[in-house]
Amino acid sequence: GILLDKLKNFAKGVAQSLLNKASCALSGQC
């Protein structure tokens, strides 16, 4: 449903920002 899609998109956004933070911290390019 729509709610599930919203949850999926939200989770995707959170995961993406976490990945970005992690890779930027690892490479030291924050």
From Swiss-Prot:
State the InterPro entries in the record. Antimicrobial_frog_2 (IPR012521)
Q: List the disulfide bonds.
A: 24-30
According to the record, the segments passing through the membrane are none
Gene Ontology CC terms? extracellular region
Q: Where in the cell is it found?
A: Secreted
Q: Which UniProt keywords apply?
A: Antimicrobial, Disulfide bond, Secreted
Q: Does the keyword Disulfide bond apply?
A: yes
Claim: ATP-binding is one of the keywords in the record: no
Tissue expression from the record: Expressed by the skin glands.
Family label: Belongs to the frog skin active peptide (FSAP) family. Brevinin subfamily.
Q: Give the protein's recorded name.
A: Brevinin-2Rg
